[in-house]
Amino acid sequence: MPEMANDPPFCGYSRPAHRLHAMNPAPPAPAATHTFVWHDYETFGADVRRDRPAQFAAIRTDAELNEIGEPVMAYCQPATDYLPDPDACLITGITPQECLAKGESEAAFAARIERLLAEPGTIGVGYNTLRFDDEVTRFLFWRNLIDPYAREWQNGCGRWDILDLVRATWALRPEGITWPERPDGGGPSFKLEHLTAANGLAHESAHDALSDVRATLALARLIRQKQPKLFDFCFALHRKDRVAQELGLPCAPAHARPFVHISGMFPTERGC
């Protein structure tokens, strides 16, 4: 989960301007049966197409964010024809030797993750997952002859990203959360370690996969506690049909409505 949180490329939330104060979303379906798998990768580089995973961690929770079962932690043995990025090893503290000693083959590693994320009703979620971790998963599955996309939509499964929820909370409902400033004074920092430190949330070791997962889950619980309607509204938008419904699609251009769009495409000084 490289920290691109201040200016990642795309995605966000839209909201009709005349409905900003009426967040009464229909409950996501199926509201009573889905579970979240909060997960994170540490990798041997930042290129999701070329670089390989080093470590994976995950925690499954119910819809109320209560943990289910034991956390998952796994290491992946690097391929013999692959050279890890030394800078990535310095950042994470994970070496190829450690992964060779503790890990399993990439095929077994991929199969384990696929079983976890493809369990019916699972919503895969994390911090910056849509732009990084999910891409790592897709290329990992592709290399190991697993359908890269099936776990994202089959059997009631889906995916979500807490980073966009954090942006929406700052822009629309900032009360109850302490928002740290970026070191350069350019606005709020959405880096996970900055947010956890500012809000007194445990984050023992940034760039350790399980520590990052627990920090992400703690931040999600805080937002859900302080802004429950916004949390439920944003979660509902992980489904394409709910997005289309919210946008009023399909509609003719003459009936299009103005929207407030919250996205990493826009700088924070513009309220996004």
Q: How should each PLM-predicted stretch be described?
A:
Residues 20-27, 221-272:
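Acidic two-metal-ion nuclease catalytic site recognized across multiple nuclease folds
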Residues 24-29, 83-84, 101:
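Anionic ligand-binding catalytic core segments
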Residues 91-112, 116:
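Metal-dependent phosphoesterase signature
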